């Protein structure tokens, strides 16, 4: 659609280029979509919808700065243009400026409260703020806890048993609060801990300085001051900390691209951990981009520099494949998981082979190719380790057979899944396997057997306090009982 001759502009209409860009975006071809929207903007430079559409592409490509520029341009004439507000929030979120993103999600929600996108944006931005340095709700920055013992003249050792139980109950929250305190106070954290230890010196706290002030009052005042500053930093640090960390990460990446680190193995392990953390936390595109960048770096290294190079590349293909699967790009996901399998076979890596077969089967099952999923997962069976993996694998193969209307095979694999779950006393997989067997027996017209399995499944659902599962099983059980009486 573009003319190659120099000096000639676009050959088609604005609407055509917009439609082309939308189609390319839907197909995940974001670079080409940017080109189409850019050409459209040469025809209508201030079109708000086109600017927002190109901004969406930039977000997908990880180019948050250009995404933000386009979003702000779309708001130039109308500050309340809700699509522009949403896109500006998305761009800020991608940049890691979660507080400002939250502001624009709220503005959009106020204008268009019926749109789910703004509600979800508020939720994810708030969660990101909490996760960046710890949830504010997990740290109560008031003079309670340790300090209250001294104000009340009670030493921590004199707690009654009920208070000790309460303390244990909240120990996890306290640990998280201390971790947050370390992050916020930095070097001052050790000073705060030292002051708290001084308070436990009964002789010292009774002393007075020349001005007549008690040492205890001075120490408590100092700790209170640090807690007050921590409350302030709890709100302020996320933005500048992320900006600093982002610049540091960019510097590290640029160094890597020009000069290999002195210890490639340690660098790779650290990077893989970052990728895993990002993907586990739901930051799929961020984790995907990191994995792709690391893959570029690792491919340029020799096996002398990184002896387990192929194993690392296999891990990266696996991460990228899982991220693409989460993003709905099944074809590319399958490609990367097959690359992982290829490397695992080449290097005779049993665990990696098992992982790749697992993921390839999941892709096939997600796109409805149940026979292919079965064939792949059956190759994984000899590699399955432990009862939990076997319970899951037998169940998934059985589910595929159920989808293919091969009910006897579905029942048999359900039985194998239940046996594996019984071996490890896993109630969740006992529940899943019982439901699978009940469904298969129902389809085979073995109604009494179906009722029996549904009843067992219902018992386990109640034990697990899974209300939604209990409700669904109860309905299926009623249907099966009705069939018995007919």
Curated annotation (Swiss-Prot):
SUPFAM superfamilies: TPR-like (SSF48452). Residues 153-180 are annotated as: Disordered. Its main location: cytoplasm. GO terms for cellular component: cell projection; cytoplasm; cytoskeleton. The keyword Nucleotide-binding does not apply. Disruption phenotype: Morpholino knockdown of the protein causes severe curvature of the body at 72 hpf. Morphants also exhibit hydrocephalus, abnormal otoliths and disturbed left-right asymmetry patterning. Some animals (17%) tend to develop pronephric cysts. At the 7-somite stage, cilia number and length are reduced in the Kupffer's vesicle. At 60 hpf, cilia motility is markedly impaired in the pronephric duct. Gene3D superfamilies: Tetratricopeptide repeat domain. It is found in: Cytoplasm, Cytoskeleton, Cilium axoneme. It comes from the Eukaryota. Component of the outer dynein arm-docking complex along with ODAD1, ODAD2 and ODAD3. This is Outer dynein arm-docking complex subunit 4. It comes from Danio rerio.
């Amino acid at each position: 659609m573009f003319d190659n001759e120099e000096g000639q502009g676009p050959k088609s209409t604005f609407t055509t280029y917009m439609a082309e860009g939308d189609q390319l975006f839907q197909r995940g071809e974001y670079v080409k979509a940017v080109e189409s929207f850019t050409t459209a903007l040469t025809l209508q430079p201030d079109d708000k919808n086109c600017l927002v559409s190109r901004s969406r592409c930039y977000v997908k490509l990880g180019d948050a700065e250009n995404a933000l520029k386009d979003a702000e341009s779309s708001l130039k004439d109308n500050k309340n243009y809700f699509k522009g507000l949403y896109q500006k929030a998305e761009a800020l979120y991608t940049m890691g400026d979660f507080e400002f993103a939250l502001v624009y999600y709220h503005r959009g929600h106020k204008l268009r409260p019926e749109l789910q996108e703004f509600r979800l944006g508020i939720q994810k931005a708030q969660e990101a703020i909490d996760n960046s340095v710890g949830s504010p709700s997990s740290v109560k920055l008031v003079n309670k806890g340790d300090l209250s013992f001294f104000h009340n003249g009670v030493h921590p050792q004199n707690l009654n048993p009920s208070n000790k139980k309460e303390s244990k109950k909240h120990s996890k929250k306290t640990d998280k609060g201390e971790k947050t305190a370390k992050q916020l106070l930095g070097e001052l954290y050790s000073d705060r801990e030292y002051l708290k230890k001084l308070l436990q010196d009964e002789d010292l706290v009774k002393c007075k300085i020349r001005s007549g002030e008690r040492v205890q009052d001075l120490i408590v005042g100092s700790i209170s001051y640090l807690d007050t500053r921590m409350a302030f930093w709890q709100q302020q640090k996320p933005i500048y900390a992320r900006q600093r960390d982002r610049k540091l990460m960019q510097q590290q990446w640029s160094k890597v691209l020009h000069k290999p680190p002195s210890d490639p193995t340690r660098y790779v392990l650290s990077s893989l951990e970052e990728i895993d953390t990002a993907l586990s936390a739901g930051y799929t595109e961020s984790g995907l981009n990191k994995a792709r960048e690391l893959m570029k770096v690792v491919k340029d290294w020799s096996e002398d520099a990184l002896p387990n190079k192929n194993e690392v590349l296999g891990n990266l293909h696996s991460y990228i494949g899982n991220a693409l699967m989460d993003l709905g790009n099944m074809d590319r996901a399958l490609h990367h998981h097959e690359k992982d399998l290829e490397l695992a076979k080449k290097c005779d890596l049993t665990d990696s082979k098992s992982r790749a077969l697992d993921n390839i089967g999941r892709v096939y099952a997600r796109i409805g190719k149940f026979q292919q999923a079965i064939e792949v997962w059956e190759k994984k069976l000899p590699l399955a380790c432990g009862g939990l993996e076997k319970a899951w694998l037998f169940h998934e193969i059985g589910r595929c057979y159920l989808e293919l209307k091969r009910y006897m095979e579905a029942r048999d694999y359900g039985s194998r899944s239940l046996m594996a779950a019984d071996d490890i006393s896993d109630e969740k997989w006992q529940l899943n396997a019982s439901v699978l067997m009940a469904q298969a027996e129902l389809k085979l017209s073995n109604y009494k057997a179906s009722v029996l399995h549904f009843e067992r499944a219902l018992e386990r659902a109640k034990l697990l306090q899974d209300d939604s599962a209990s409700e669904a099983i109860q309905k299926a059980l009623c249907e099966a009982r009705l069939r018995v009486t007919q």
